Amino acid sequence: TSMSHNEAGNYKDGDGNRVHSSFERRNQMLQLGFTPTENTLLTGTYERSRGEAAYADRMMDGSKFDRDAWNVRFVQRNITPWFTELELRYGQSKIDHVMDTYSMRYLSMMGNQVKKAMNPKRETNTGHLKATFDWPDINLQTGIDYMRDKHLSRMEMNGEGYRHKPYQPQQNFTQWGGFVEGAWTASDSRKFISGYRYDEVKAEYDTLI
């Protein structure tokens, strides 16, 4: 397990003027592992992050930076004399951000008098499966990858609030990939390696209303 906390207040420039630049970030991570047999491994990880940041160079501040992520991993070794390893991984992360003009500054700053906010949200799912085979002088690895990346958002333009509004889709990405790599040890001084990978990506875009 691990934890970290970082923060800083606004600093002053060479003329003693306060610069809008404070930030805070809190992170926690927990990882557990289990080995039911000498050839089997199970692990699980959870990560949590919370933060906020003030920006002197733009019209909005990051009043909410939330991220939650988890993943699991399974490894089985020495399944047969030639099927040496099977690995499976799956994970998910969720990001919830808020950028606004009023939570961390006065509305009069930078000449902005209107309450505005953007609330983007993102969810990513990933998967990975790999098998390893070994014969005398030959090693073969093959597997598949998967990723699903979903983006949503909602906004506030005239102080009407955003929390009651539904999220609108912005863009989605789906990726499937397959790979194979083989290695042949011809002699103590010669080794030949060859591989192939194929990926298919689908992208969908929507306009935020």
Language-model region placement:
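Face-selective signature of the C-terminal outer-membrane beta-barrel domain
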Residues: T35, N39-S49, R67-I209
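Periplasmic-side early beta-strands and strand-to-turn transitions of outer-membrane beta-barrels
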Residues: T1-F65
